Amino acid sequence: MAPAWSLLLALLLLSCNAICSLGCHLPHIHSLANRRVLMLLQQLRRVSPSSCLQDRNDFALPQEALGGSQLQKAQAISVLHEVTQHTSQLFSTEGFGAVWDESLLDKLRAALDQQLTDLQACLRQEEGLRGAPLVKKDSSLAVRKYFHRLTLYLQEKRHSPCAWEVVRAEVMRAFSSSTNLQESFRRKD
């Protein structure tokens, strides 16, 4: 009887190890969710970008954090989470609802919340496999500083419609870069 239990236990441990070693694979549906967020951000455009040319600014999008070749998959998940979280916080800011259609904002927030839930589950899974937090401090700090610059810009411009348009376009750029990063890792899998 003992050898049968030993065999079952060994098979269970091997199958768990095989499943756990797969790591976090963001499903194709998550990629579609990213595209949905980009589509919603595009639909939010209310001001012609050409009328806001004088308001444009270089916010120094952290390309190394969003697409650097040195970024490992686990760290990329952390960066994707950071970008999504800051985007969600930015579009939950008080006092800008008058600029955009509230129903579109609700859809955007819901899509971002779903992505955060997916990414948090992924982070927990990856951290469980590695036993340590995944955050690469340089990348995380670069993303936080980038979104801080966007927030300061909005305050400086008093949340004007043109300022929000510039920020909306900039967030689309950041989100597009994070989507490209995610898809590059998905192709490698």
UniProtKB/Swiss-Prot annotation:
It comes from the Eukaryota. One of its GO terms (cellular component) is extracellular space. It is found in: Secreted. GO terms for biological process: adaptive immune response; B cell activation involved in immune response; defense response to virus; humoral immune response; natural killer cell activation involved in immune response; positive regulation of biosynthetic process; response to exogenous dsRNA; T cell activation involved in immune response. Residues 1-23 form the signal peptide. One of its GO terms (molecular function) is cytokine activity. Disulfide bonds join 24-122, 52-162. The keyword Disulfide bond applies. The keyword Secreted applies. Produced by macrophages, IFN-alpha have antiviral activities. Interferon stimulates the production of two enzymes: a protein kinase and an oligoadenylate synthetase. Belongs to the alpha/beta interferon family. This is Interferon alpha-F. The gene is IFNAF.
